[in-house]
């Protein structure tokens, strides 16, 4: 049975605006799909984050291309514009909802099979292999953007007690956002510790003027004189983060369309969605939270977020060298 609000809107669109039969059918199909996305939640209570998630990663996960998503977004925008005009709702959640850019094809989401192959590629017997594994782990296990990984300093890693263990929590600032604090899944935590405790890293001068240290270092920047190759000039560039994905992806035989840092972020977001992680936690972990809608919360309990990150990140569904080590350590002797 079609929601009465949708029926009223479609009738208005058809009789008042003279919309064609084809438009009416397309809008109806789009809104019914939005109802499926809401999964029983009231249409009148949809938030900015709901419509953004629907028009973006959810439809993308359903196999709807950027071009094909435009009619869905048009239907949802028109529907909520009508609800606002009829005073059924106080504010329009789609006001800032834009159409997807179609000038360039979005990178494919990396599959779990590809992610597993990728994580087996770095050589843990070498320093650059451990460094690359740590970079890939943050992209896959925390859903960071390449700029976010590049900008990290050691001070962005903070330790907390969690179920008797010392675990890392990550302070992240991406794309001009306010700083957000997110948990580091267990496997990612272990790879980061392997990297930070490596003897080769200790020999590199990566200290900044404020006493902090660059987290991820470049190893072969030939454009910088040796005596200047210290501090912030040792920082791995965002472009180099993408090159690490391509290098190990090509080595593992992964399709070229998946070899982009954002393809790993898409997989991370999809796993959170498919694992039924609470919407508010999902928004915080992805950095999608709307400050207006979350201002009433001081913060979510970090232990709750840590448990969800351990449960729902892509590493829980793939086999990796570090995952095998964790499994062995957990077995009783």
Task: State each model region's role.
Residues 1-333:
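Conserved catalytic core of the tyrosine transesterase superfamily
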